[in-house]
A protein has these predicted regions:
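Alpha-solenoid helical repeat scaffolds
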Residues: 1-302
Length: 302
């Protein structure tokens, strides 16, 4: 490993491997010197100093861990990794009150940048998963954060992702709707809600999501696609036809040809139901130009 390090230079992966080997050899001094050298090699990258603190803490060197975290925070007071690591230090040393204060300072303080709070919350989730996989603690913290700052869309988005990862789709719905209230352009939240509505065949909900989705993101063809289907299911054929025609105005060279083909194919179906055969065949022709394998268009054409 030393020879490889001479060739490619010091890096995290090599240093961590050497650290583990030295620990197995029960040479703690050389093990920690390895990470200390890594931190010295990259003095402006606080990740390595924080990593050194974490390794101190994991190996029972609590005072060294505390001093290292304080050093990081003296250089970068807003360093989320170090702030959370310090909270972990307080927890592991039985200082529950200081632990809770540190967590609250990080997660329930509007002066802390939103991105920092989200990063810390991710660390909080990882720690909770490693310790007990108990979701109640994480959910309780998310609920407190949402009450503290109801206008930040990043926190509820992370909350919804967490709930979905736990199979709690029903509980994620109001959280995702809160995201859209804050930021109607959040396509990820809207598409997740849309997927849920489609699985339940709730076409009124699909309409309620896609209509404002088009206003917020007029270039997103997915919303036109599903809105047209929902209108069709609701027997609003003229509305479906109009929305597909509107969608075609936003087609670009980068648009998925299969989606554009489906627009034309569904327009053909609507024209066919209205006995407008010339328009129907013209639409099917266009569908096959974009996707010669469009089964729906081929069958209807036949």
């Amino acid at each position: 490993l030393d020879r490889l390090e001479q060739i490619i230079g010091k890096n995290e992966q090599l240093s961590m491997e050497k650290f583990r080997i030295y620990l197995q050899m029960e040479d703690d001094k050389k093990a920690f010197q390895e990470i200390e050298k890594l931190a010295e090699e990259y003095p402006m990258d606080m990740r390595y100093l924080t990593l050194l603190g974490d390794l101190y803490l994991q190996n029972g060197k609590k005072q060294e861990a505390y001093s290292t975290y304080q050093k990081v925070l003296s250089i970068e007071p807003d360093n989320a990794m170090a702030m959370f690591a310090l909270a972990s230090y307080y927890e592991q040393t039985g200082q529950k009150e200081l632990y809770q204060q540190q967590i609250d300072t990080l997660l329930l303080n509007n002066q802390v940048p939103s991105e920092t709070r989200v990063n810390v919350m991710r660390e909080f989730i990882v720690q909770a998963e490693q310790e007990s996989k108990d979701s109640t603690r994480v959910i309780a913290m998310f609920d407190r954060m949402l009450r503290q700052d109801p206008d930040d869309d990043q926190v509820p988005m992370l909350y919804a992702q967490y709930l979905l990862s736990k199979g709690m789709e029903k509980e994620s719905i109001p959280v995702l709707k809160q995201v859209l209230q804050i930021d109607p352009t959040n396509t990820a939240a809207r598409m997740t809600l849309l997927g849920s509505a489609i699985r339940k065949n709730d076409f009124q909900e699909v309409i309620g999501l896609c209509e404002p989705g088009i206003e917020a993101n007029p270039e997103s063809l997915e919303f036109y696609y599903y809105l047209g289907i929902a209108y069709y299911q609701a027997e609003r054929l003229d509305d479906a036809l109009a929305i597909y025609q509107r969608a075609l105005q936003h087609v670009t060279a980068d648009s998925k040809k299969e989606v554009v083909s489906d627009f034309y194919s569904m327009m053909g179906d609507i024209y066919h139901s209205k006995d407008k055969m010339a328009e129907a065949y013209a639409a099917y022709d266009s569908a096959l130009v974009y996707n010669p394998s469009n089964i729906g268009a081929l069958n209807n054409y036949a």
